[in-house]
């Protein structure tokens, strides 16, 4: 099937594909066996509608996507006659228009489309589970958490648009930027609101942050890419036309020009796309995704991510501090967290991009990148006992097209702690991979989101959860979950962090324990049929969170102390706990965030079109690893 002829999950006829996807969605329950979709044939059809293969007439590069210099959709969304937050006007029929002919009485009613009916049933099922969440009995801790989450809501022009990062009364005079609405911080709050059936605040957030995407942003006279989403925004009141008695509210975004280190938030746009899909799936409001300004926003984000550069790998090249770990921690290059979110955002965008002549090249670029990225991460980032032993025996300085040690990794890079730490059964995706460098630290968010998005294979996903279970005292201990393990210490800490006083060993981003990761751990456990692990982690967190006043993070190797600079009443700690509880009680709702494996995606290798003796694809040699 030619790549240009692919249908994606959009309205009209392609809506059948969306319904097929719904039918193929995993039904979650307490048993892992219940996670298998019953309609395998329908699921396969949906995957075919969602994936591309390269026909023989395509170029070896798959007609690589080139971001347009001028986007007419962009111009339309910014025109004064069509403000970004207004839906396109609906053309009314003229008075003299001929009305449609009435159906003759006695004729049988047209048959209902079974696929569309199934799609509607799926949506009704999700809404029924939302009602179940709303009616469930809440514990004392949950009631307190909802009260605190409600107090954190930020309003703009009379409508709720987000939640502040923290609402700690003890630091009222030293708020820094904790009184702002962060995109990444709001995601667990948005999930909590959606699971509770309160979607308006999420819709407002999506649209207002979309408006901010078009703002001019400069740092020392230099402007980053047009599609960059802000890290955060703040609602400010300013005098109206110099009148000290009249004020108007404005949104003041921060694109990184005020952040510590002046780093652009690479993950903001990725989270925005993931949240947009979740909102549509649980509310059924797909009209939001179809708006011209929203479609333009998606394309601009993808333009930044899919632009050609000097990199030889399908992974995104970013600088230190461009994601949740927003301080210098040695993650510059191709950090796993960004790659997992990137893969998930591409999967979500592929469902939402409108299919037309102007989007064919973009859709091809998405599919090629998904195919290459999944292979790259699964093949080169995965380590278990067998892989570590293989690296231990690597030969170096191999100059050939069929080298085994492709990245010239020196066996001496294997840290001394790893051989004794990694269990016999289990493994994980390493934190980073570059020429002559592997970061063997375990990063929780990247590994968990690799499970959620199906970036990791089924076997790898099981191995990651097996490792967490085997190393419970290291990763969970007294408070879930370690943001990374182990911490940088001694000379390594001084060199890599620059002697950062906030990232001392086993504190903050350097091995601190972050309760907000609980909701992502719960999602991963639900997907893999391991709700028992999520329940254990939630029980550990419940013992302390309310009593400790909902801290941002915990310190020490086992997470016993509240972080030395931790804010209390941290919103994403509160929201992460609430989302975890609701997801665990109604695991069917996890489908709004989870992406199932698409096996046909693995066949979309661009280099299969024009192979030569000089360029050989590594996929055949690694096929068993990828498809497991």
Swiss-Prot record:
Residues 1-35 form a transit peptide. Residues 79-90 have a biased composition (Low complexity). It catalyses: Hydrolysis of terminal non-reducing beta-D-fructofuranoside residues in beta-D-fructofuranosides. One of its GO terms (biological process) is sucrose catabolic process. It holds the Pfam family Glyco_hydro_100. It comes from the Eukaryota. Expressed in roots, leaf and stems. Mitochondrial invertase that cleaves sucrose into glucose and fructose. This is Neutral/alkaline invertase 1, mitochondrial. It comes from Oryza sativa subsp. japonica. The lineage of its organism: Eukaryota, Viridiplantae, Streptophyta, Embryophyta, Tracheophyta.
């Amino acid at each position: 099937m030619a790549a240009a002829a692919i249908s994606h999950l959009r309205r009209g006829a392609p809506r059948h594909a969306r319904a097929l996807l719904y039918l193929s969605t995993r039904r979650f329950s307490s048993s892992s066996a219940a996670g298998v979709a019953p309609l395998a044939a329908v699921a396969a059809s949906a995957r075919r509608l969602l994936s591309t293969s390269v026909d023989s007439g395509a170029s070896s590069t798959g007609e690589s996507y080139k971001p347009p210099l001028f986007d007419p959709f962009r111009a339309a969304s910014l025109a004064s006659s069509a403000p970004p937050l207004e839906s396109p006007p609906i053309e009314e029929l003229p008075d003299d228009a001929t009305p449609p002919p009435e159906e003759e009485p006695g004729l049988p009613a047209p048959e209902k489309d079974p696929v569309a009916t199934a799609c509607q049933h799926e949506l009704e099922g999700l809404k029924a589970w939302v009602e179940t969440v709303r009616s469930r009995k809440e514990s004392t801790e949950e009631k307190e958490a909802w009260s605190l989450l409600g107090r954190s809501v930020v309003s703009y022009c009379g409508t709720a648009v987000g939640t502040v990062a923290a609402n700690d009364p003890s630091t009222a005079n030293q708020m820094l930027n904790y009184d702002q609405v962060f995109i990444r911080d709001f995601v667990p709050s948005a999930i909590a609101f959606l699971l509770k059936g309160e979607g308006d605040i999420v819709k407002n957030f999506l649209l207002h942050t979309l408006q901010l995407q078009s703002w001019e942003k400069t740092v020392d006279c230099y402007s980053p890419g047009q599609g960059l989403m802000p890290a955060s925004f703040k609602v400010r009141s300013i005098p109206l036309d110099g009148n000290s008695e009249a004020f108007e509210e404005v949104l003041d975004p921060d694109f990184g020009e005020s952040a510590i280190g002046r780093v652009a938030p690479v993950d903001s746009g990725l989270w925005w796309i993931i949240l947009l899909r979740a909102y549509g799936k649980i509310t059924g409001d797909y009209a939001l995704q179809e708006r011209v300004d929203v479609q333009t926003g998606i394309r601009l984000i993808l333009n930044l991510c899919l632009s050609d550069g000097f990199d030889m790998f399908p992974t995104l090249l970013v600088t230190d501090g461009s994601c949740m770990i927003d301080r210098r921690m040695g993650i510059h290059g191709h950090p796993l967290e960004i790659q997992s979110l990137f893969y998930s955002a591409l999967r979500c965008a592929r469902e939402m991009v409108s299919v037309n002549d102007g989007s064919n090249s973009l859709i091809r670029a998405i599919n090629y990148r998904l195919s290459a990225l999944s292979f790259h991460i699964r093949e080169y980032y995965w380590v278990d006992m067998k892989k570590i032993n293989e690296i231990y025996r690597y030969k170096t300085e191999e100059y050939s097209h069929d080298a085994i040690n492709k990245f010239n990794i020196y066996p001496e890079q294997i840290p001394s702690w790893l051989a004794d730490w990694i269990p016999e059964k289990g493994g994980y995706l390493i934190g980073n991979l570059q020429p002559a460098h592997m970061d063997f630290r375990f990063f929780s968010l990247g590994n968990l989101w690799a499970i959620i998005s199906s970036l990791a294979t089924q076997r790898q996903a099981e191995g990651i959860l097996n490792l967490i279970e085997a190393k419970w005292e290291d990763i969970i201990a007294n408070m879930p979950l370690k943001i990374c393990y182990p911490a940088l210490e001694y000379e390594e800490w001084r060199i890599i962090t620059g002697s950062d006083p906030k990232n001392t060993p086993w504190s903050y981003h350097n091995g601190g324990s972050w309760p907000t990761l609980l909701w992502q751990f719960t999602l991963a456990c639900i997907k893999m049929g391991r709700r028992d692990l999520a329940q254990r982690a939630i029980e550990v967190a419940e013992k302390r969170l309310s009593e400790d006043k909902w801290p941002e993070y915990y310190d020490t190797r086992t997470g016993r102390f509240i972080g030395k600079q931790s804010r209390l009443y941290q919103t994403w700690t509160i929201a992460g706990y609430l989302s975890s509880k609701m997801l665990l009680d109604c695991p069917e709702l996890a489908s709004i965030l989870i992406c199932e494996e698409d096996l046909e995606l693995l066949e979309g290798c661009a280099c299969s079109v024009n192979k030569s003796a000089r360029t050989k694809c590594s996929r055949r040699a690694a096929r068993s690893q990828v498809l497991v």
